[in-house]
Structures are given as structure tokens and as C-alpha cells.
């Protein structure tokens, strides 16, 4: 995106919303609390419940204000007084989700608050009808082209108001939402940026803007207001963009300046650790959060993902039952129950609960991705592809959906499609070894072996989660008859798994020892060959080969065959694996500069 397309000049707009000063200074927490309490009330009056809740939770984390410092409610304008009866009635209808009825009684109102509720009621009415049609007529996996029919009319009306500079911060927010829904992304970004300047304390505008930012470069070109709210926005967008180190630093700074009791910040830190697969840390933080806020449901689906990965059935069962008691019809609750059934390998039931979650909120990203995983388990690749595609429609930054699509096309033996989707996943998670190993396998199938080498080595260099990159790289060197490089990879693999004490599948370990035994035997390095052959005897699939090789080594030694001192060996075996401490010749480490990205 060009810089000029994202930088907007903000002109004054007519507004009945009180001026809300919001500098970037955190030194006056009392003033920040006043601002949060005020914006919580203003958003609540307009039916923006999530923004109101966010502001109220953040305000609650700060020290209480004395009576003398509590702000009076905003003054009522002449227009507000004229529309008071209609607004009061319409807001009651709005609160019980009778949106058309609310809009009917607000038609013709002139105050900014009543006008926003009128337009917002029309928008939500269209969204509700669209969702009803999606669920009832087509089902959650056949969303098709169902649209909110009210969007175009709303855009025309809001555009006229915008050109006349008659939209306040809330009106700009709604205009941006309408533009985003119509896929007018560039225009939506400009309007949301304008909304943050006009009303910087409205979290909803920041959040909508966050959903449209695709990379860090795009973020640099935004002309954002210099406000303390910007710090919360940056922490959130860094988490979304997988810039976890920067995100954690931002959240730590916010804790240091006085928001240490904020459950929102604590939950975001847990999500950040989840994103970098620091499972122990994330679990610990979520458990602490549950103690502080036992009835919290937000982010509990992420908590359940961690319990799922660790196969903690009893803890996941307890969480599912607990959330059912709190609110069984929340999206997060359905996802937690789905994860519970998935862990028990009841994939049909799991998919059913993810579908229930999508009936409650068709734009809930986690449910689409998890349902795709379940269809993969059920070998229903076409349904899995649809689910993953819906997840990408909701959020193009979801690497799990791109990775899932790569896996489905790998099953369908379509390597070029597979390569495309794995590349997209890798772009979003450049330091995730799983994406790199998947890319390497794709390149290998396409006979692009140099690229495959790069991917496997890079996967090892960034921290191989599954401990498979070196094995795959070694097998690739075997295939290319690069015996010394293959041996070095196998030795490094063995050193790694023995140094961390991790239990691995026997097939991988035995494969490494079998190759090394044969390699050292060819090099006439009897001690090393004997040590590896003895290790082969510990595994069923290599036991006979190991015994045969030991007999050959013994026979050659009895015949007086001397070990070689000229043929190079990769480097020493770990001391615990060597038959003795007899030194062997060591060559320079493997030169991987030619295959390192």
C-alpha cells in the first residue's frame, strides 16, 4: 500500500460527543480512568457493547476515583432533548434485538446519538437476516454469496454525511464497518484512521483497523493519533502479526505503568505465548487468569487448544463443564466442547459443536479452523477445504488455515497447490519449523532438491519443534549420495535427541544408527561402527543388521584389518555412545552455506 493511500488529514466534524483528550502520557492514571468511564457510557448508549465492556474492564483495573473527581454525565443538547422519547423507546427495542422496530421509531431523528442508533439498527438488521439465511437455508459450510442487503443503502447515506463533515467518531466507525463489509478495504482503512483521530478512546475503531492491517510495512504508513490508546492497539496488532517479542514488550510496558490488574492484558499475554508455542508459560498464565476471573469466557477456547495439545483430558473436561454452567450458548463454550470431543477422537461430535459455534457467530475464526481440522480427521477433504477457505475469508492472517489447506492438497496429491498454501503459511510464520518442513517436503516431491535442502536446514536453525528436519535433510543427502553430509546430519540429530533427553520414535533413531554404522564401517572406523551397530541391536527393525555388522567387524579385526586414518569421519559420536574414547580423525563441519537461505 502506498503511503498516500493510508495517511488521512482529519478535519473537524460536527459532534455531540464531548471532547475526550487522550495524550500518550500514562503519568496521570486518574485522568485515564475518567476517560475510560466516560467512553464506556457513551459506547453503551449506542449499543456498542463489546467496546463498552472493554473500556469498563480496563477502568476497573485502575484505582477507584474519589467522589469529588467523578465526572458528571455529558450535557444534553437541544437535539438530544427533542429526540429523547424516540431514542429511549428505540434503545429498549434495540436491546432486545428488535432492530427494524428500533430503526422505525428513530427515522427522522437529528441528534448524533439517535442518528447513529438508527443507522446501526439498520446495519444489524441486515446482518441478522443474512446470518439467518446463511444458517437456515444453506448451512454453515455453504455460505455462498449471501449478502447484507442494507449495506449499499447505508454506504450511500453515510457517504453523503461524510462528505458534508457531519459524522462524529461513532458515525465514522460505522461508515468504516460498512465499507469493510463491501470489501472496500482502502477506503475503510482511511475512514477508521479518521475515526481514531476524532474519537481516540473508542476501542472498536482501533480493533476494526487492526483487522485490516496485513503486515508491518502497512502499519508504518498509517497516520495514527498520538494517544495512550495507540499503545494498546500496537500491542494487539503485533500479536496478530506474530511479532510476539514486540507485543510482549508492549504489554509489559502497560503493566509497568499501572495496568497490572487488567485481565485483558493478562489474557493477551497468554495468547501471545500460545502463538509462539510456549505451552507451559501460556498454561500457567491462563490458570492464574482463571483464578482471578473464574467466570471469564473470552479466550477460553485458546486455553482449551493448549490443553488439547498437551492431551490433558481431565482438565479439558472440567473446563468444558465449567463453561457450560456459565453459558452453554457462547461461541467459546462450543469450541471448548468441540476440542474435548476431538481429544476423545469423537470427531463427528466435535464438528457438530464447531457448527453450533458458527451458527452463533458465522465470523468466528477459531471455529472455522477447528472444524477444518475435524473434517481432515474424518477424511472429508472437500469439507475441510471449504472450512479453511471460510477461515481465510474471516482473517487472511490465520496461518493455521493456510497450513490446513496445504495439508488437504497434499492428501489430494496436488503438490503445486500444496506449495502455494504452505508458502502463505510460512510468510505468516517465518520462524515456525513446521511450515518449513512442510515446504521442504513439497519441494522434494517437485524434485526441487536444492530448495528442499534450504527449507530443512532453516527448519533446524530456527528450532525444530518435531525433531524431523535433520532426519529429512539426511535422507535427502542419502538420495543424492552425499554420504558425509548425510552422516553429519544423522550425528547432529542423535546429539540433539540425547542432549535433551526426549523420547523419539524408534524408527527415526534406528534409521540414524543404521546409516552411521554402515558409514563408519565403510570408513573402516571399527570403534564407531561397533558403537552404532550395538545401538541398532536395541531396535526391532535394525537388530539383525546390527548383529550382522558386529560379526563382520569382529571378523575383520581378527584378520588383523587395521582402522583407517585417512578416510574422514564427520565428527565424534557423543561420549556416552562410543565404545571407547579412542580419538578419530575429525573433518571440518558440514559446509551448508550453499543451502542456507
UniProtKB/Swiss-Prot annotation:
Please give the residue positions where the record annotates the modification Phosphotyrosine: 273
Question: What are the N-acetylalanine sites (modified residues) in this protein?
Answer: 2
A GO CC term attached to the entry: anaphase-promoting complex
Instruction: Report keywords, A-Z.
Output: Acetylation, Cell cycle, Cell division, Isopeptide bond, Mitosis, Phosphoprotein, Repeat, TPR repeat, Ubl conjugation, Ubl conjugation pathway
What pathway is it annotated to? Protein modification; protein ubiquitination
Residues annotated as carrying Phosphothreonine in the record are 562, 565, 582, 596
| Positions carrying N6-acetyllysine | 467
- InterPro entries membership: APC8, TPR-like_helical_dom_sf, TPR_rpt
Q: Where is this cross-link: Glycyl lysine isopeptide (Lys-Gly) (interchain with G-Cter in SUMO2)?
A: 147
Family affiliation? Belongs to the APC8/CDC23 family.
Name the job this protein performs. Component of the anaphase promoting complex/cyclosome (APC/C), a cell cycle-regulated E3 ubiquitin ligase that controls progression through mitosis and the G1 phase of the cell cycle. The APC/C complex acts by mediating ubiquitination and subsequent degradation of target proteins: it mainly mediates the formation of 'Lys-11'-linked polyubiquitin chains and, to a lower extent, the formation of 'Lys-48'- and 'Lys-63'-linked polyubiquitin chains. The APC/C complex catalyzes assembly of branched 'Lys-11'-/'Lys-48'-linked branched ubiquitin chains on target proteins.
- Protein's UniProt name: Cell division cycle protein 23 homolog
Q: Where does this protein come from, organism-wise? A: Bos taurus
Gene that encodes it = CDC23
Amino acid at each position: 500500500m502506498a503511503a498516500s493511500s493510508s495517511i488521512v488529514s482529519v478535519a473537524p466534524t460536527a459532534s455531540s460527543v464531548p471532547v475526550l483528550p487522550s495524550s500518550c502520557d500514562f503519568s496521570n492514571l486518574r485522568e485515564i480512568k475518567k476517560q475510560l468511564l466516560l467512553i464506556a457510557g457513551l459506547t453503551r448508549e449506542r449499543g456498542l457493547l463489546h467496546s463498552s465492556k472493554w473500556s469498563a474492564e480496563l477502568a476497573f483495573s485502575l484505582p477507584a476515583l474519589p467522589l469529588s473527581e467523578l465526572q458528571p454525565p455529558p450535557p444534553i443538547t437541544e437535539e438530544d432533548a427533542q429526540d429523547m422519547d424516540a431514542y429511549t423507546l428505540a434503545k429498549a427495542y434495540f436491546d432486545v434485538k428488535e432492530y427494524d422496530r428500533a430503526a422505525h421509531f428513530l427515522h427522522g431523528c437529528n441528534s448524533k446519538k439517535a442518528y447513529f442508533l438508527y443507522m446501526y439498527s439498520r446495519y444489524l438488521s441486515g446482518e441478522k437476516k443474512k446470518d439467518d439465511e446463511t444458517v437456515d437455508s444453506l448451512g454453515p459450510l455453504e455460505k455462498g454469496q449471501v449478502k447484507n442487503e442494507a449495506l449499499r443503502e447505508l454506504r450511500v447515506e453515510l457517504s453523503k454525511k461524510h462528505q458534508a463533515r457531519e459524522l462524529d467518531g461513532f458515525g465514522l466507525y460505522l461508515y468504516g464497518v460498512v465499507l469493510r463489509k463491501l470489501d472496500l478495504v482502502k477506503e475503510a482503512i482511511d475512514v477508521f484512521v479518521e475515526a481514531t483521530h476524532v474519537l481516540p478512546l473508542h476501542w472498536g475503531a482501533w480493533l476494526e483497523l487492526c483487522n485490516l492491517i496485513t503486515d508491518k510495512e502497512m502499519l508504518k504508513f498509517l497516520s495514527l493519533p498520538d494517544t495512550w490508546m495507540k499503545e494498546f492497539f500496537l500491542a494487539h496488532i503485533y500479536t496478530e502479526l506474530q511479532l510476539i517479542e514486540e507485543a510482549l514488550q508492549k504489554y509489559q510496558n502497560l503493566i509497568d505503568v499501572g495496568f497490572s490488574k487488567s485481565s485483558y492484558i493478562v489474557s493477551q499475554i497468554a495468547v501471545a505465548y500460545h502463538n509462539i508455542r510456549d505451552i507451559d508459560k501460556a498454561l500457567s498464565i491462563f490458570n492464574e487468569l482463571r483464578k482471578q476471573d473464574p467466570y471469564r469466557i473470552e479466550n477460553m477456547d485458546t486455553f482449551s487448544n493448549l490443553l488439547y495439545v498437551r492431551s490433558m483430558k481431565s482438565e479439558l473436561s472440567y473446563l468444558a463443564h465449567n463453561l457450560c454452567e456459565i453459558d452453554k450458548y457462547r461461541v467459546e463454550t462450543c469450541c471448548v466442547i468441540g476440542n474435548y470431543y476431538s481429544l476423545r477422537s469423537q470427531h463427528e461430535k466435535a464438528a457438530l459443536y464447531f457448527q453450533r459455534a458458527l451458527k452463533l457467530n458465522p465470523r468466528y475464526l477459531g471455529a472455522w479452523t477447528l472444524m477444518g481440522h475435524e473434517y481432515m480427521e474424518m477424511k472429508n477433504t472437500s469439507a475441510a477445504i471449504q472450512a479453511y477457505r471460510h477461515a481465510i475469508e474471516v482473517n487472511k492472517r490465520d496461518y493455521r488455515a493456510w497450513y490446513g489447506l496445504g495439508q488437504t492438497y497434499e492428501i489430494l496429491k496436488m503438490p503445486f497447490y500444496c506449495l502455494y498454501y504452505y508458502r502463505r503459511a510460512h510468510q505468516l510464520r517465518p520462524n515456525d519449523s513446521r511450515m518449513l518442513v512442510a515446504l521442504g517436503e513439497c519441494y522434494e516431491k517437485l524434485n526441487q532438491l536444492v530448495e528442499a535442502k534450504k527449507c530443512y536446514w532453516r527448519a533446524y536453525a530456527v528450532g525444530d519443534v518435531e525433531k524431523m528436519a535433520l532426519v529429512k535433510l539426511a535422507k535427502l543427502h542419502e538420495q543424492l549420495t552425499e554420504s558425509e553430509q548425510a552422516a553429519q546430519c544423522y550425528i547432529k540429530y542423535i546429539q540433539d535427541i540425547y542432549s535433551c533427553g526426549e523420547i523419539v520414535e524408534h524408527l527415526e533413531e534406528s534409521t540414524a544408527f543404521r546409516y552411521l554404522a554402515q558409514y563408519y564401517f565403510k570408513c573402516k572406523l571399527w570403534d564407531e561402527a561397533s558403537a552404532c551397530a550395538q545401538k541398532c541391536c536395541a531396535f526391532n527393525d535394525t537388530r539383525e543388521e546390527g548383529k550382522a555388522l558386529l560379526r563382520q567387524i569382529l571378523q575383520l579385526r581378527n584378520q588383523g584389518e587395521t582402522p583407517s586414518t585417512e578416510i574422514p569421519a564427520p565428527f565424534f559420536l557423543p561420549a556416552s555412545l562410543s565404545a571407547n574414547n579412542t580419538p578419530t580423525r575429525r573433518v571440518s563441519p558440514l559446509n551448508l552455506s550453499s543451502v542456507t537461505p
